[in-house]
């Protein structure tokens, strides 16, 4: 299933982004209200997935074995909208997925190396970790991704350095 724990917050206003980003302020004050329990987020995402696929079982043209298989969520893509590393309880959420034997892949914009460190230090790394690299240099990044934090380039380089040492 594809989901995000940070739908209302991102610290960039990428020119190519199709998501509504008018509310993104750079202060991420909206994330202060993101207190949802990680287990509730995971369970709600699974229930949403099951609702989404519920109509396929009645279609005679659909492989019923595939319908049955799709009812067991095996993978979570944490990348739908917003910046997931802004969710303070992300380590707990990733551990919850692991406890349910669900693989996870996380896509980050790289502006929060401190969360990557926390994931590493708390043994909460996702199954796969991706960082969007949208530009080759600071000037182009600023033009394309329109970061809302002043020290964005240092943060990008910090995340890349951290990722280089992860296993």
Language-model segments: residues:
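Amphipathic alpha-helical interaction motifs in eukaryotic regulatory proteins
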Residues: 15-18, 46, 91, 95-98
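N-terminal pre-triad scaffold of radical SAM enzymes
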Residues: 1-20, 77-79
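N-terminal [4Fe-4S]-dependent radical SAM core
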Residues: 1-7, 21-41, 47-65, 69-70
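Conserved AdoMet/S-adenosylmethionine-binding subsite of the radical SAM
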Residues: 57-167
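Long, hydrophobic, well-ordered secondary-structure blocks that form the structural core
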Residues: 22-36, 42, 96-100, 105, ...
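Short connector loops/turns at beta-strand edges and beta->alpha or beta->beta junctions
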Residues: 8, 20-22, 134-138
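Cys/His-rich zinc-coordinating "finger/knuckle" motifs
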Residues: 17, 21-24, 148
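Intrinsically disordered, low-complexity regions enriched in proline, serine, glycine
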Residues: 13-15, 26-27, 116, 142
């Amino acid at each position: 299933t594809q989901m995000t724990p940070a739908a209302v917050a991102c610290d960039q206003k990428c020119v190519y982004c199709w998501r509504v980003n008018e509310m993104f302020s750079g202060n991420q004050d909206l994330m202060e209200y993101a207190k949802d329990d990680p287990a509730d987020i995971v369970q709600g995402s699974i229930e949403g997935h099951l609702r989404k696929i519920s109509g396929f079982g009645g279609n005679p043209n659909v492989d019923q074995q595939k319908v049955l298989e799709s009812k067991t969520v095996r993978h979570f893509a944490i990348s739908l909208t917003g910046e997931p590393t802004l969710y303070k309880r992300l380590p707990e959420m990733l551990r919850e997925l692991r406890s349910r034997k669900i693989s996870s892949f996380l896509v980050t914009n790289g502006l929060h190396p401190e969360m990557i460190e926390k994931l590493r230090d708390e043994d909460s790394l996702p199954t796969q970790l991706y960082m969007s690299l949208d530009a080759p240099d600071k000037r182009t990044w600023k033009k394309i991704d329109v970061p809302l934090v002043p020290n964005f380039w240092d943060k990008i380089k910090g995340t890349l350095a951290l990722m280089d040492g992860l296993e």
